[in-house]
Amino acid sequence: MNVHRPIAFAALLALASPSIADSAIAQTAIAAAVAKPLSLPDIAIGSEKATVTITEYSSMTCPHCAAFGQNVFPMLRSKYIDTGKVRFVFREFPLDIKAAAASILARCIGNGDSEKYLSAVETMFKLQDRLMAQTKDTLMYVGKQHGMSEHDVETCEKDQAQFDKLTADQQYAVQELKVTSTPTFFLNGVRVQGSMPFEELEERIKPLLRK
């Protein structure tokens, strides 16, 4: 029996290796697809040298996205992003025209600055119920809170090129990354659907930091 065990174990390894290799290759391909530059520049914070990259697909009108942004993201940021361990990428996946309009406004407010963009997102998540009920008035309010005039907001929302890019990036997420709902996360290319408490997210992060 002792003689055959190593042989049997070796045979099992031989059988398992192709699937393990295939899985690793597939995971690498997904990670590359997630990291691919899109039509709109990524909203990213944290060190580019971080071991872990978390990409979130979010909608401004998604209650679970707002809950994550308000309850989980601050802890993620203080413990992992600001310490250089995690790079966080925020991507829009608007579930409706109201979310799309809010995303476009955040882009205008940010104007290439990820921190300003995320500050606008934070404001809109806090006002999510109002955004859903009184979209135009809420967008005007948020714009003014972030230094824009009424004319600036109106001009921003008429930028068809931005809407087209937003749509193209969402189609890529659906077709290539199989994103179908929000929030959807990719942790170094591993897809995780749905919001989660900080403790669960941390348990997913820790093994990636050790690799």
Regions of interest found by a model, annotated:
Residues N2-R5, D22-A31, S59, Y141-K211:
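C-terminal cap of thioredoxin/glutaredoxin-like
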Residues L38-L40, K126, L187:
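Residue-level signal for pocket-adjacent positions within structured domains
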Residues L13-A14, V72, M124-L127, H146, ...:
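Alpha-helix boundary/capping residues
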Residues H64, I97-K98, K165, Q193:
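Secondary-structure boundary/capping motif
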